A protein has these predicted regions:
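Residues that scaffold, gate, or flank divalent-cation-dependent active/transport sites
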Residues: 1-106, 111-113, 120-128, 137, ...
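Generic, ordered loop/turn and secondary-structure boundary motif
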Residues: 12, 39, 51, 95, ...
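Amphipathic alpha-helical interaction elements
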Residues: 68, 131, 212-213
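Short secondary-structure boundary/hinge segments and terminal tails
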Residues: 77-78, 147-152, 211
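Short acidic/polar capping segments at secondary-structure boundaries
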Residues: 111-113, 142-147, 180, 199, ...
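Structured, non-catalytic alpha/beta "coupling" segments that mediate domain-domain communication
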Residues: 121-163, 221, 226
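Compact, charge-rich alpha-helical regulatory domains located at protein termini
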Residues: 155-227
Length: 227
């Protein structure tokens, strides 16, 4: 099997920007009504010094024309459902996913790559249709859904040199350089691992399995095994 992950960066922001006629400082906010904070912001807002985690009032002081829109989880869920329906033209197996870093789709593309005479042509077709729908995405290929998602997230984090894993035999070597931030583990676990000098997935794979599970939990070991 060959899975393709389509990782959509900041889906709430992409959905909001589709309805704007011009590019203005834009932020998606969440939290209690009396103290909303910035969850996502576009490039124009970031250029004004606005960052995720800031209070809305502080952000508005930096950009007086800032548009602040409340996050709509139901809209995100429906958008992923619509994208999943769209994805069935490329695969009989389509799985939507959501996460802190990105939302997106997983598609099993073994047959599709043969139909399109290779993954490059398939990529071009999917990317073009996503643009027409108003979305952008980072792509990642691997024999397992989890590994494909991690590779897509690595590209989303700026690792444009990240390789895909088209064959099971190449998977471990392809995954080894991945930053552990791509694993979507909680910030505390990531910080602890980095403090121990364990910044890459390959560093984790070299650790004794029993000791790793005892220190960080069997669910983390299961994540690695499922990749």
């Amino acid at each position: 099997m060959l899975w393709l992950a389509l990782c959509l960066p900041a889906l709430p922001l992409q959905l909001a920007e589709r309805g704007l006629g011009e590019t203005l400082p834009l932020a998606i906010i969440e939290g209690p009504p009396q103290r909303p904070v910035i969850a996502f912001c576009n490039l124009k807002a970031a250029a004004a010094g606005i960052l995720p985690g800031q209070k809305l009032a502080a952000a508005q002081a930096l950009a007086h024309d800032l548009i602040g829109l409340e996050r709509n989880l139901e809209r995100e869920r429906l958008a992923l459902q619509e994208l999943a329906c769209w994805g069935y033209q490329f695969s009989a197996q389509v799985v939507p996913f959501g996460g802190e870093t990105a939302s997106g789709l997983l598609l099993e593309t073994g047959a599709s790559c043969r139909l399109f005479d290779g993954h490059h042509a398939l990529d071009r077709r999917i990317a073009a249709e996503l643009r027409q729908l108003g979305y952008s995405a980072a792509f990642g290929y691997a024999p397992t859904p989890r590994a494909a998602r991690w590779i897509g997230l690595a590209r989303l984090h700026g690792r444009q040199e990240q390789r895909d894993a088209f064959e099971p035999a190449t998977l471990e070597n392809v995954l080894a350089p991945l930053p552990i931030a791509c694993l979507e583990w909680d910030a505390g676990t990531v910080a602890t691992l980095q403090a121990l000098g364990l910044g890459r997935l390959g560093d984790l794979l070299r650790l004794p399995r029993t000791a790793f599970a005892r220190r960080f939990g069997p669910e983390r070991l299961d994540d690695l095994d499922r990749a």
